[in-house]
Swiss-Prot record:
GO biological process, any: positive regulation of insulin secretion involved in cellular response to glucose stimulus
Lineage, uppermost ranks: Eukaryota, Metazoa, Chordata, Craniata, Vertebrata
Organism: Mus musculus (Mouse)
Name of the protein in question: Protein TUNAR
Protein task: In neurons, plays a role in the regulation of intracellular Ca(2+), possibly by acting as an activator of ATP2A2/SERCA2, thus increasing the efficiency with which Ca(2+) is removed from the cytoplasm. Inhibits differentiation of embryonic stem cells into neurons and inhibits neurite outgrowth, likely as a result of its role in intracellular Ca(2+) regulation. In pancreatic beta cells, lowers Ca(2+) levels in the endoplasmic reticulum and enhances glucose-stimulated insulin secretion.
Complex and partners: Interacts with ATPase ATP2A2/SERCA2. Interacts with ATPase ATP2A3/SERCA3; the interaction occurs at low levels in low glucose conditions and is increased by high glucose levels.
Length: 48
């Protein structure tokens, strides 16, 4: 027997949480890329 939740609030909460997690993941990736760019510029600047 499968128990399913017929509650729309739970489903909406899960969708909101999923969207929130994807936004946070995207921000993390963007932050990592920006950090790498800064590290590369600092490395180039200090080696000149």
């Amino acid at each position: 027997m499968v128990i399913t939740s017929g509650n729309d609030e739970d489903r909406g909460g899960q969708e909101k949480e999923s969207k929130e997690e994807s936004v946070l993941a995207m921000l993390g990736i963007i932050g990592t890329i920006l950090n790498l760019i800064v590290i590369i510029f600092v490395y180039i600047y200090t080696t000149l």
